[in-house]
Amino acid sequence: MNINKQRVLDEFFELIKIPCPSLGERQVADLLKQKLEELDGKVTEDMQAAKALNGTAGNIVADFTGTVAGAPRILLNAHMDCVNPCAGINPRMEDGVIKSDGTTILGGDDKGGVVAILETLRCLKEQNLPHGDIQVVFSVSEEQGCAGAKNLDTTLLHSDIGYALDSSGRPGKIIFAAPGQNKIFAKVHGKTAHGGVAPEKGINAIKKAAEILMDVPTSRIDEETTCNIGIIHGGSATNIVPDLVEIAMDCRSRNPEKLEKLTADIVAAYKKGGEKAGVPVDVEVKPSYKPYCLAKDSKVIRLAAQAAENLGLPVDITATGGGSDSSHFNGFGIPCTVLGTGMTNVHTVDEILLEEDLYMTCQWALDIICLAAKQ
């Protein structure tokens, strides 16, 4: 019941070399469809998500019939897209550490998870290992607010529990709780005028926005609640008084009541700030996903923890402040945890992945499936 380490490494290098920005996953999606079909999977491309997002590919869903009746049906998830810069990745190995050449990301987020799922499927087939039904979901656009999973055609899903292989932290890390997220968009309106000829006839939306933002909650609110002002757009030229500023932020909490209150407080702060500044402010709230909290003794957590212990891995059952596709799977009614894959310094050109962690993630995923078939 052992993985093929050389095959894992070769496939990881193969996949990370394919450019796959969010909404541009077509090339890697075609390759993964081929690989899944070669493993006897019933493969479906979820075009509902592709159309909703106007992307080049949809989520890839593949079903594999189990050999053990009554075993839990398990969903395995990883995402196909990467953040930029992800074109021209030139991987290298130095003393057991996989890294890029420093001009791009590495792509372990989340090709490490993709490779682990593929290797698990191969080992099950080649070694005739007992297993229950398996459903693989390779999602698109995870790096853009988990948009692929959010727009997934849920009629395709029929799993009992799920594992998203998509967390920083070494194998053995198991996420039992994650926050819900709301995105908040505000438009601060001013009045345009010539900045040199008649600035007093204008109302500077940038200055007004700055005044308003002084009273908008931000950063860490408490141990499980945060909010962040992430994007501000405004102005078109230095000699024009800007008449519009657009602000985007998100707020998160693992407590649904706290998330609701923080969202309401932010909206109220914008409205009150606009009244105080004497300018109109439009505010829109877009819920992204709901928080979840899995019992530490639930089946999905217990299986992952037992498999990790059997491999001698230190088990770390913990909460996170980040979102992932698992948030949506839990929302769809499938208890789903996130597993640590060893990805480090993600979303930067300093990203690395220990060779040992790449292999161990594959072995851990395989052992979870085999352990589930025995229970």
Name each region found by the language model.
Residues 198-232, 240, 257-281:
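Acidic-enriched catalytic cores of C-N bond-cleaving enzymes acting on peptides and small amides
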Residues 29, 56-57, 63-65, 69-138, ...:
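Active-site metal-coordination/substrate-binding segment of hydrolases
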Residues 1-26, 287, 344-348:
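N-terminal capping segment at the start of a domain
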Residues 13, 17, 228-236, 250-251, ...:
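A short beta-alpha structural unit
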Residues 207-222, 228, 289-337:
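Active-site-adjacent substrate-binding region
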Residues 104-179, 227, 231, 238-239, ...:
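Acidic/histidine-rich catalytic neighborhood of metal-dependent amide-processing enzymes
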Residues 21-70:
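A non-catalytic alpha/beta surface segment that caps or lines the substrate-entry region
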Residues 8-9, 58, 232, 243, ...:
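Zn-dependent metallopeptidase/amidohydrolase metal-coordination segment
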